[in-house]
Design a protein with these regions (language model features):
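Bacterial N-terminal signal peptides
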Residues: 2-12
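Loop/turn elements at helix/coil->beta-strand transitions in domains of secreted/extracellular proteins
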Residues: 18-23, 53-58, 112-118, 159-165, ...
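Active-site segment of extracytoplasmic enzymes that catalyze sulfate/phosphate-ester chemistry
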Residues: 24-27, 31-121, 125-138
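Active-site-proximal cap/lid insertion segments
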Residues: 29-42, 142, 155-161, 166-311, ...
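A generic secondary-structure signal for well-formed alpha-helical elements
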Residues: 30, 54-55, 64, 78-82, ...
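Short, solvent-exposed loop/turn elements at domain surfaces
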Residues: 32-36, 59, 82-83, 174-176, ...
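Acidic, His- and aromatic-enriched active-site or binding-groove loops in soluble protein domains
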Residues: 118, 134-157, 162
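Polar, glycine-rich mid-to-C-terminal structural blocks
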Residues: 359-367, 374-377
């Protein structure tokens, strides 16, 4: 007995630590088109099973509908106008987060907390030293099932440390060219699907009838929209098979009930009217959390959460968050980290200090159907590519939503793949008065300075109340909230209130 007693605390510690694993799944340009969100045609049994066994958030939002900028918010807990990732990371004319974000970066903080960290799939943000993982796994980001198989050895490694796996698909992002098999002059994009109805290795591809696809109200109900949506749904169904494989690996390894699983997307689907906008269709994302330690399951929550909440939540789950200060417990100041690292230019380190997260942990509200989180939400978009400058700032309080189009007067810029899409081009060639969903082509391109919507009555933002004198007090109140947010988060574009 005297031999065993000293080892009991050690064994308990190892067992507990090894249980607090995290898998964070982020898809690429996916709206809540899932069975668990009521979509009538989606094939998503694996994701649906996570919802049945966890908490599904009905009001979860990205803070920007652009890939790199959104991913920087996900992995820093900071709005992109503050972390420096103003737009896309790729190409020579790229953006990158400020180096001082290293103090709050999710993979860095979890590594400091004793996690082994791994990444597979799409990365698409910079600098790597700020968002560094211990292990980078190589997999086909268009084949989530193969990605899961590649990640198996990392997940099941014989290691007393808990793991954090960042699992990022490239589906259902546009890509792979256009499908020439469709009739007409405008061909749908493949959305990563293979030509001639071929299948990725190990995947049972699911094909959708364009005539049976539900067309969301922000899109025109045209053959072009339907054919592209059919490819989009196929790409989403492929993701689900990868998640099923992940779940299988976890269960076979006795890790399913020791692993937090989060499923979301960087922002809404890759169609004009959604991606790169701050409209509902651009920011509303699927968000499901399965916490194995939460007894209440199958919960649908109407609490408002955002991508800025992700990093503090996962750090909180790892018991590494100082909730009072909203910062890591073992906080490593950025200046201390970069000391003696002269290769990092001091003029690119960003704001001082980076000491706390903009978002808040949702761990305490998991399993609580009637819990609230944020009363007011904010979104911030500035660039997509560097040539696609159109800063927008947004605030909504559950009833009213204000959009400030800072560059109003300039034509609204398009992501190149959205501009080239058959869905958009088919309407564009009909002229400015042609309807694109609930907007005209012309009104989509030429935006007013302010847009005010009652989102409880007008979810998809058809009726702009900003110029209605009956709503002048509400407009000014929302402007004040937006200014306060910009001031609190050191938004450089706050100066535009005064100078433009």
């Amino acid at each position: 007995m005297r031999i065993l007693i000293p080892f009991i605390p050690l064994l308990t510690s190892i067992s507990y630590a090894a249980e607090k694993n995290i898998i964070f799944i982020v898809t690429d340009d996916q709206s809540p088109t899932l069975g668990c969100y009521g979509d009538p045609v989606a094939i998503s049994p694996a994701v649906d099973s996570l919802a049945q066994d966890g908490t599904l958030f009905k009001r979860a939002y990205a803070t920007t509908a652009s890939c790199s900028a959104s991913r920087s918010v996900i992995l820093s807990g900071l709005h992109n106008h503050f972390n420096g990732q103003f737009g896309h990371q790729h190409a020579y004319h790229k953006f990158a987060s400020f180096h001082n974000v290293v103090a709050l970066s999710l993979p860095r903080v979890l590594s400091n907390a004793g996690y082994r960290t791994g990444q597979i799939g799409k990365y698409h943000l910079a600098p790597e030293e700020v968002y560094r993982f211990d292990t980078y796994l190589k997999g086909n980001a268009r084949n989530a099932k193969q990605m899961a198989s590649v990640a198996k050895n990392f997940i099941t490694a014989d290691d007393e440390k808990p793991f954090f796996l960042y699992f990022a698909t490239s589906d259902p992002h546009r890509g792979g060219g256009d499908d020439a098999s469709y009739p007409g002059g405008h061909k749908p994009n493949f959305f990563g699907n293979l030509p001639n109805k071929a299948a990725y290795e190990g995947v049972d591809e699911v094909f959708f009838d364009p005539n049976k696809i539900p067309v969301p109200p922000f899109l025109p109900d045209t053959p072009e929209s339907r054919s592209e949506l059919a490819h989009y749904y196929q790409s989403c169904a492929r993701i689900d098979q990868g998640i099923a494989e992940l779940i299988k690996i976890l269960k076979e390894s006795d890790l399913y009930d020791k692993t937090l699983i989060v499923f979301t997307s960087d922002h809404g689907m890759a169609f004009a009217g959604a991606k790169t906008t701050v409209f509902e269709a651009g920011l509303h994302v699927p968000f499901i959390v399965r916490n194995p330690y939460e007894k209440k399951r199958g919960i649908e929550s109407y609490a408002m959460i955002s991508h800025a909440d992700i990093t503090p939540s996962l750090v909180d789950f790892a018991q590494a968050l100082d909730r009072e200060k909203n910062q890591p417990k073992n906080f490593v100041k950025a200046d201390a980290y970069w000391k003696n690292k002269d290769y990092v230019a001091k003029d690119n380190r960003g704001h001082r200090p980076y000491t706390s997260y903009h978002g808040d942990s949702w761990i305490p509200i998991l399993g609580k159907k009637n819990a609230s989180h944020h009363e007011t939400m904010f979104a911030s978009h500035t660039f997509h590519e560097i040539t696609m400058y159109y800063p927008m700032r947004t605030v909504w309080d559950g009833k009213y939503k204000l959009i400030w189009n800072i560059a109003s007067g300039l034509p609204y810029p398009f992501a190149s793949d959205l501009w080239a899409s058959s869905t958009w081009q088919a309407q564009l060639e009909k002229g400015d008065d042609a309807l694109y969903g609930y907007m005209s082509v012309g009104s989509y391109i030429d935006r007013p300075a302010f847009e005010l919507y009652n989102v409880t009555e007008n979810r998809y933002e058809e009726v702009n109340l900003a110029s209605n004198p009956e709503y002048s007090k509400i407009l000014e109140s929302m402007k004040a909230k937006l200014k306060a947010f910009q001031k609190a988060t050191n938004d450089p574009w706050i100066s535009k209130w005064e100078y433009e």
